[in-house]
Amino acid sequence: MNFFLYFRTIFLIQLYFFNYSTFGCSASSTSVQSDTTNQVSVSCPKYTTIYTSGTSPDTKTIYPESTSTKSITTSTQSHSSPVIVVSTVGTVTETTISGSTEYTTTIPAEGITSGTVEIVEPTAGTVTETITSGTLPFTTTLAQASGTVSGTVEIVSPKNNPTTVYSGTVATTETFSSSTVVVIPTAICDGVRGLEYAVYDYTISSSMNEFCYPKNGQTDVFAFNEPAYFGSSDLDQSSPLFTGVFSSTDDIPEWASSWYLPPYPPQASDMASTYCACKVIVYQFFLRIPETDTYTLVVNNVDDVFFGWFGDKAISGWSNNNFDAYSYWHESPNMGLGTVGMGNFTVGNYPEGYFLPVRFVVANGAYIGGFDFYFTSDSTGPLATTSYSYTKTCTQQFLPFGQGNGGVNGPTEKLS
């Protein structure tokens, strides 16, 4: 065989093997000898692409062409030559459209030479899809989570139904049960989350001495009989001692029997270092009903006096004589001197999603003070009040502190 023919033969063999080497494939190197038939095996591995959208993974398996075998017969001259194998590309990228958001998937490759396909989902944010149910459209929003980033699924129902947000911390591939989900209602319009309060000095001169400075060493709780005074034009409400708003994630600290005010935000340390004698705290908020049921208000540790109003009169018109709940510090023959006030009050039966106006006035005379409360029902159990509290709803809001009462004049009848 002359040199030209030999070179041409080697070139064709190499070109043949090059054509049979494909992405992700492997081929063996063989020695070609005279008068001998040899086989070169070219094989491609199987690739599996996993697409995940929402909670239902979809798996697509891509099979290469079957393994090919080719017989090559050489001339009588003995020689050997390497088979050219193209190495696997390091990264294969495929762009897929999900809704209106592009994202890139990469697929782990298999074979002798490894390749990695990176999965790049949209930057943490939201993907929104509008769905129509009957004649009422509603929107579902999926906020994508990764690692320890908090993930949220918000379901916005038609406006005549309430909305629920299920939120929790999730890992990239973790699924958590409903028992770990915190259920917090979401406003169906422009409601503002929060529970407002204001703290005042007690300055009603006609009863201050009996309430704040008792002569016999014991506060006269019945001397505090004008709760609507805290909401009148006669009381200077322009400069309360403290004001604040509890957010939906704040817990209301229990005001256990103490010489000091409770540590409410945003000035918790200042309040906690202020003596509570002769002080009044006013609370106002809308309670959003989580489930249709009959609800009860439970108050504990009342020291010294508590008044409560529910419904529209809690926004404007509350008076000294139309309160819905009342409790006070008192002695109990069965429990001994110093028993604090407590009580359960039926608020009423309300439908899911209803915003109930609520107003409390809590006053402490001499010595230590205290107050604690929560709402409950058979279907929900005790509620975390701030998780269901709003400073205003789509159609209603509270007046500034110091406005809106409906009956300053005329004290309450003495209760015993």
UniProtKB/Swiss-Prot annotation:
Annotated organism of origin: Schizosaccharomyces pombe (strain 972 / ATCC 24843)
Family affiliation: Belongs to the mam3/map4 family.
Sequence repeat intervals: 90-124, 125-160
Transmembrane segments: none
An MF annotation (GO) of this entry: cell adhesion mediator activity
Keywords: Glycoprotein, Repeat, Signal
Residues carrying covalently attached carbohydrate according to the record: 19, 344
Keyword flag Signal: yes
CC annotations in GO: external side of cell wall
Residues spanning the signal sequence: 1-27
InterPro entries, alphabetized: GLEYA_adhesin_domain, PA14/GLEYA, S_pombe_Mam3/Map4
Residues in PA14 domain copies: 224-390
Listed GO biological process terms: flocculation
Top-level taxon of origin: Eukaryota
Region (2 X 36 AA approximate tandem repeats): 90-160
PANTHER family (alphabetical): M CELL-TYPE AGGLUTINATION PROTEIN MAM3-RELATED
Gene3D superfamilies: 2.60.120.1560
Compartment annotation: Cell surface
The name this protein goes by in its record: Putative cell agglutination protein pfl6
Function (record text): May be involved in agglutination during conjugation or other aspects of colony formation. Induces flocculation when overexpressed.
Keyword Transmembrane assigned: no
